[in-house]
């Protein structure tokens, strides 16, 4: 996964403008100097987890000067997740960040930053916003409220000496790779320090669906069950699924149909939560799946065979051929 594994010094320096380290006050020589992005973030409060993430990600170097890139006008734009945004992922305290690989964390942070001043006037529905990581972000208008991917924009145009800050309610995630590669990335513990989606990966390989999920011309919406979701499925079926290879105890056709119930070719391509509406959607295998109400930025997902709906554990992971939402139950039809 090229974007996850190749970090450039210039990108690391770029994100440093939103972090705080010792010696910070020395950068401000005059009492009337306009605050930097880092000073603005600290003064607003509620961004201590973002600071801790930047430090752990190896990008905690304060820039007292402006963006050196000539075309940037000396500015950066930062979409800044609040502490509550990190808490959605279970990252409540600084030590919780240890569950993320450092290189992954760094790339996550860089996805929130772009060169130049991107003001609110540019945040219109359908707009594409670049990032220092590479993949672009999408601005979505949902009933008059604006989102960047699936993250609601809470505040805009917070001015700084070296750019602009917009406040958002979710951490933005992008893999820079296709759906199959993204699954491999997490299953091999390159994102989290413990493997995740490894049961899903085994199922995809067992059913020979990796090619379909790698299709560069596709633009799928995928609901990806966690490892625990597959273990729970084993309990339901009476077939212990204690490790990924146990998936092969089940008939291949059965597993194939289960997997296809999680993949959707929706009109307009892969959908972020901000683009999904309550109601019935049709999976690749023709089965109907019900989306629940849009509450606090997520929706539940339920098949006709589920006794309870699945919740989104990690929503809105952007890939090169769709959007992945990690869920806590396997969809059954």
Predicted features along the sequence, with ranges:
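Mature, structured domains of secreted/extracytosolic soluble proteins
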Residues: 2-9, 13, 21-333
């Amino acid at each position: 996964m090229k974007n996850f594994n190749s970090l450039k010094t210039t990108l690391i320096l770029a994100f440093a403008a939103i972090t705080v380290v010792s010696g910070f006050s020395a950068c401000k020589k005059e009492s009337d100097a306009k605050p930097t992005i880092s000073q603005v973030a600290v003064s607003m409060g509620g961004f201590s987890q973002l600071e801790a993430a930047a430090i752990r990600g190896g990008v905690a170097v304060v820039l007292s000067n402006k963006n050196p890139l000539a075309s940037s006008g000396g500015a950066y734009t930062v979409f800044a997740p609040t502490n509550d945004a990190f808490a959605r992922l279970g990252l409540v305290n600084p030590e919780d960040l240890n569950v993320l690989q450092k290189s992954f964390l760094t790339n996550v942070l860089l996805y929130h930053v772009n060169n130049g001043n991107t003001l609110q006037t540019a945040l219109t529905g359908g707009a594409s916003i670049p990032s220092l990581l590479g993949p672009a972000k999408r601005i979505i208008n949902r009933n008059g409220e604006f989102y960047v991917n699936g993250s609601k924009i809470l505040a805009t145009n917070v001015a700084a000496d070296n750019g602009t800050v917009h406040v958002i309610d979710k951490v933005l995630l992008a893999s820079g790779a296709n759906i199959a590669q993204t699954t491999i990335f997490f299953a091999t513990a390159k994102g989290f320090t413990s493997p995740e989606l490894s049961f899903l990966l085994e199922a995809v390989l067992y059913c020979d669906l990796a090619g379909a999920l790698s299709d560069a011309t596709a633009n799928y919406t995928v609901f990806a069950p966690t490892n625990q979701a597959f273990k729970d499925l084993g309990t339901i079926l009476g077939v212990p699924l204690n490790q990924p290879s146990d998936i092969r105890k089940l008939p291949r056709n059965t597993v194939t149909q289960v997997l296809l119930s999680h993949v959707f070719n929706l009109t307009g391509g892969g959908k972020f939560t901000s683009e999904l509406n309550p109601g019935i959607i049709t999976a690749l295998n023709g089965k109907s799946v019900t989306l629940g109400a849009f509450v606090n930025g997520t929706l539940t997902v339920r098949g006709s065979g589920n006794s309870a709906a699945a919740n989104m554990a990690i929503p809105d992971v952007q890939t090169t051929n769709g959007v992945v939402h990690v869920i806590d139950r396997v969809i059954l039809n």
